[in-house]
Curated annotation (Swiss-Prot):
<feature type="binding site">
    <location>
        <position position="358"/>
    </location>
    <ligand>
        <name>substrate</name>
    </ligand>
</feature>
<feature type="binding site">
    <location>
        <position position="437"/>
    </location>
    <ligand>
        <name>thiamine diphosphate</name>
    </ligand>
</feature>
<dbReference type="InterPro" id="IPR005478">
    <property type="entry name" value="Transketolase_bac-like"/>
</dbReference>
<dbReference type="InterPro" id="IPR049557">
    <property type="entry name" value="Transketolase_CS"/>
</dbReference>
<dbReference type="InterPro" id="IPR009014">
    <property type="entry name" value="Transketo_C/PFOR_II"/>
</dbReference>
<feature type="binding site">
    <location>
        <position position="461"/>
    </location>
    <ligand>
        <name>substrate</name>
    </ligand>
</feature>
<dbReference type="GO" id="GO:0006098">
    <property type="term" value="P:pentose-phosphate shunt"/>
</dbReference>
<comment type="subunit">
    <text>Homodimer.</text>
</comment>
<dbReference type="InterPro" id="IPR029061">
    <property type="entry name" value="THDP-binding"/>
</dbReference>
<dbReference type="GO" id="GO:0004802">
    <property type="term" value="F:transketolase activity"/>
</dbReference>
<feature type="binding site">
    <location>
        <begin position="114"/>
        <end position="116"/>
    </location>
    <ligand>
        <name>thiamine diphosphate</name>
    </ligand>
</feature>
<dbReference type="InterPro" id="IPR005474">
    <property type="entry name" value="Transketolase_N"/>
</dbReference>
<keyword id="KW-0808">Transferase</keyword>
<keyword id="KW-0479">Metal-binding</keyword>
<keyword id="KW-0460">Magnesium</keyword>
<keyword id="KW-0106">Calcium</keyword>
<feature type="binding site">
    <location>
        <position position="469"/>
    </location>
    <ligand>
        <name>substrate</name>
    </ligand>
</feature>
Length: 665
């Protein structure tokens, strides 16, 4: 009969052996949190290793993702499709055990973690998703959505500022099914955290309206079990269980020190650990009886079977609700989607209007969201400016089944929370702020791209066109930095029609985020043929053409397209053959086949001009090294928008003059 400590030691030794074998990794945290993990995973976690995607599973998030071997050991021991050979390939090319957990690479990994604190933020999003979905779909006696979100965090996660943003909001939202375990070992890479992290964590979380369980012995299984039971009794507050642990537990010479944090322990020390823990087995060998104690496939399958039976009864009693639930969970758009969106886009083209693209975005939401209950929006305290609310928005603070989150001034937290909402399933999140403040959200934006998360970023006030607020609020380099990030589609529409198309493409995109870059100021609408209207969805299309062998091509986006078109027509009046290309989404255009790209930007035309109120460098890929770019070289200034556009050269006359020089060169 194996004790709980011996079962936990299986985690410790697998982690130690994998790190040693890879000659790289972090053994200390898995050794320190193994006892907590054993209690949670064997006694409380609702999951099915035979079906990692079971909809009503509990979510487990390893926010301190450097300790990934803890999670891989758990997945292997409980019966997920992660054989011992994969643990032997830890941190190696093409393995299922990368250095930090990556969703999509390893069965059972809910979200990619590693940048500290973001896993915690994702978990807050998952807890929001669980509660909002359950409030919408559950009925008396049919709690088809009823699961917990469990999180492991370390000192580093709680030092990161994002932890304040998301834990403050989680307490405000009373997320009672969010339970966090804090691995309080007092050690980080530089040494003892007492020299730089003296917060009273318990009081901090009490101030956030969390239920706090302090001074829990993280190596005492009974204490851990009691604390989890107490946490589950509290339904109107998230809980944090502060566990006092020893990093590198079991290592005679390196436990409790930074030496055990992020490097292999060495063969000599590992031999001593085996003696200390009485683990008399060679590397990567686990006794059959321990495997048997850990394996959760049979129990997990029973849990899912019971849920399936309940859902079958739910389907019989609530056929419409159950059909809608399955549609959303399976990420299917409504049957009327194409009809509604295409009709709306055609309507806009026929009913021309000069409005800001942020207003066009709100109008589009009003139309599309009516048939998309899975849309869940939010803004970082800029809803009236971003125009992200529509007539049927309900705050989830006031209505648990609502569709809008007031995130407060928390751009980073907002973005990472919505990543978690997306990964939970059942929702398409959109989040909003000024384009300039993507800088606050940057790493969560990158993580969305890395994970191919379906998440729509709404970034308004997109250029010097926001005017008097000045260079602190005027984006310059942000557009380019977003465009060069893999997996993100960045749309900068020029009028209400392109805005509606951008929203349609963002919602239809199945893998990866989309950024909608929207103006503060009004934009004129352009005439288009039916072919041009259809070609918007290809990312770039011919807006104006002289219909003969071309002398010059203009490329522009957003608010600068109108002055570019006027300048081009002025050149055409002199007899030059010109083309104007609207390029609202460069990445979508880049994915088109060679024939379409040659059709829009024929290679024989070397004289090209790009016009956009953002940093110039990005556009050389389209105009060539000898092309002309009318863009930003510096930061902006504080002045009315019209004065700034004139100062920085976004005028018909300047575009005309520079193009004429190019033509005569």
């Amino acid at each position: 009969m194996y004790s709980r400590k011996e079962l936990a030691n299986a985690i410790r030794m697998l982690s130690i052996d994998a790190v040693q074998n890879a000659q790289s990794g972090h053994p200390g945290m898995p050794m320190g949190m193994a006892d907590i993990a054993e209690v949670l995973w064997r006694s409380f976690l609702k999951h099915n290793p035979a079906n990692p995607n079971w909809n009503d599973r509990d979510r487990f998030i390893l926010s301190n993702g450097h300790g990934s071997m803890l999670l891989y050991s758990l997945l292997h021991l409980t019966g997920y499709n992660l054989p011992i050979e994969e643990l032997k390939k830890f941190r190696q090319l093409n393995s299922k055990t990368p250095g930090h957990p990556e969703t999509g690479e390893t069965p059972g990994v809910e979200t990619t973690t590693g940048p500290l604190g973001q896993g915690l933020a994702n978990a807050v999003g998952m807890a929001i998703a669980e509660r909002t979905l359950s409030s919408y779909f559950n009925r008396p006696g049919y709690d088809i959505i009823n699961h917990y979100t469990w999180v492991f965090v370390g000192d580093g996660c709680l030092m990161e500022g994002i932890s304040h943003e998301v834990c403050s909001l989680a307490g405000t939202l009373n997320l009672g099914k969010l339970i966090v375990f804090y691995d309080k070992n007092g050690i980080s890479i530089d040494g003892k955290t007492a020299h730089w992290f003296t917060d009273d964590t318990a009081k901090r979380f009490e101030s956030y309206n969390w239920h706090v369980l302090d001074n829990i012995d993280g190596h005492d299984s009974e204490s851990i079990e009691r604390s989890i039971k107490q946490a589950k009794l509290i339904t109107n507050q998230p809980s944090i269980i502060i566990c006092n642990t020893i990093i590198g537990f079991g290592s005679p010479n390196k436990s409790g020190t930074a030496e055990s944090h992020g490097a292999p322990l060495g063969e000599v020390e590992i031999s001593l650990i085996r003696e200390q823990l009485k683990w008399n087995y060679p590397p990567f060998q686990i006794p059959k009886e321990i495997y048997k104690k850990w394996n959760f496939i049979e129990e997990g399958s029973k849990l899912e079977k019971k849920w399936n039976e309940k859902f079958s009864l739910y389907q019989s009693k609530y056929p419409d609700l159950s059909t809608e639930y399955l549609r959303r969970i399976n990420k299917k758009l409504p049957v009327e989607w194409d009809r509604v969106t295409n009709n709306y886009i055609s309507f806009l083209q026929k009913n021309r209007q000069s409005i800001a693209s942020r207003k066009a975005s709100q109008n589009t939401l009003e139309k599309y969201a009516m048939i998309l209950p899975e849309l869940i929006g939010g803004s970082a305290d800029l809803s009236p400016s971003n125009l992200t609310m529509w007539s049927r928005c309900n705050s989830i603070k006031d209505n648990l089944s609502g569709n809008y989150i007031h995130y407060g001034v928390r751009e980073f937290g907002m973005t990472a929370i919505a990543n978690g909402i997306s990964h939970h399933g059942g929702f398409i999140p959109y989040t909003a702020t000024f384009l300039m403040f993507v800088e606050y959200a940057r790493n969560a934006v990158r993580m969305a791209a890395l994970m191919c998360t379906k998440h729509i970023f709404v970034y308004t006030h997109d250029s010097i066109g926001l005017g008097e607020d000045g260079p602190t609020h005027q984006p310059v380099e942000q557009l380019s930095s977003l465009r060069i990030t893999p997996n993100i589609d960045v749309w900068r529409p020029s009028d209400q029609v392109e805005t509606a198309v951008a929203w349609k493409k963002a919602i239809e995109k199945t893998s990866g985020p989309t950024a909608l870059i929207l103006s503060r100021q009004n934009l004129d609408q352009f005439e288009r043929s039916s072919e041009q209207l259809e070609n918007i969805s290809y990312g770039a299309y011919i807006l104006y053409d002289s219909k003969k062998r071309l002398d010059i091509i203009f490329i522009s986006t957003g608010s600068e397209l109108n002055v570019t078109l006027i300048a081009a027509k002025k050149l055409a009046s002199l007899g030059y053959s010109v083309r104007v290309v609207s390029m609202p989404c460069t990445s979508v255009f880049d994915r088109q086949d060679a024939s379409y790209k040659e059709f829009v930007l024929p290679t024989y035309v070397a004289k090209r001009v790009a016009v956009e109120a953002s940093i110039e460098d990005f556009w050389y890929k389209y105009v060539g090294i000898n092309g002309v770019i009318i863009g930003m070289k510096t930061f902006g200034e504080s002045a009315p928008a019209e004065d700034l556009f004139k100062k920085f050269g976004f005028t018909v006359q300047n575009i005309f003059n520079k193009s004429l020089i190019l033509l005569k060169s």
